[in-house]
Amino acid sequence: MRNNRSGKALVLALALCISLLSGCSQPQTKESSESCTPQSGISDISTTESSGFEVKENASVSFLGPEGTYTEEAAKFFFQNTQNFIPKKTVDEAISEVISGNADYAVIPQENTLGGAVTNYIDALIRETEVYVVGEVIIPINQTLMGVEGATLDDIKTVCSHAQGLTQSKAWRSENLPDAAEKEMDSTAAAASFVAESKDKSIAAVAAPGAAELYGLTVLAENVQITDTNRTRFYVLSKTKNPSSGKRAVFIANCEANRLDDIIIDLSGAGFELVTLHDRPDGTKLGSYNYVIEAEAKSISDDMISEITKHDGIRFAGCFDNIEKQP
């Protein structure tokens, strides 16, 4: 048994090494009509964004609201020629707008430099099988502490924000507001709105800088995150597979951990380079997980996708390119 486990570990380690090296030697592959090339029936695509992503004319975009969230900033940066943005209270509601046809796209947080994967939003993506990842936008995150007019740091007894905002500002708060309690909110902008409505000098919010002006709050401290390199990745979702030739694919797998080595070996063999892997318990039994797997290739074909989705319990969830907003 010990030798068998050692052998599996060796195979997995070798596969990871091959995956990391494959970016320098991936084969050229044909474009895929199934995965990353234009789908039949899409005739209303007219606007091309800076990422090469083609956007439906008069597109509507749902996002985690209210106004003033980082998700709104990401959505407006990605969809620079779109005017119809729909703020929703939760990510589930934002995705539901796309599924119901009320929105063409949804933008949801995916991963942060400091807070890691945004697990509840990844869970929402795992649950919904009717949407695909068609784009990604990365923006810098500069968390700001804000309170009502006249408030000072000495007044603050409670700091509210989204869970990610609380995590990203924890070190700063430990040093500057060590006795202040935490209050988790649905979003950073919801926290700013809550503080504004409370008119309470003892409550502050950690939110995007623009939220202070939007909700009439006073900036108490800037850049309260741990590092200036703080970034968040956001997925762009649609009911239709990406009509452009993305170089990154995402798969969602439901399996036990000991099946991962086979999947990773097949990724490398198909010409992919493993980029990220997030795991979430599937709620059925110990040791059984849902995995969100991202992999890159110079181009992506039907055969490459099929090589991965031949495994039971693994599905293709889209391909995309990304754009990044500079600080």
Give the positions of each predicted feature.
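Domain-level signature for soluble enzymes in the chorismate/prephenate branch of the shikimate pathway
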Residues: 2, 10-14, 18-327
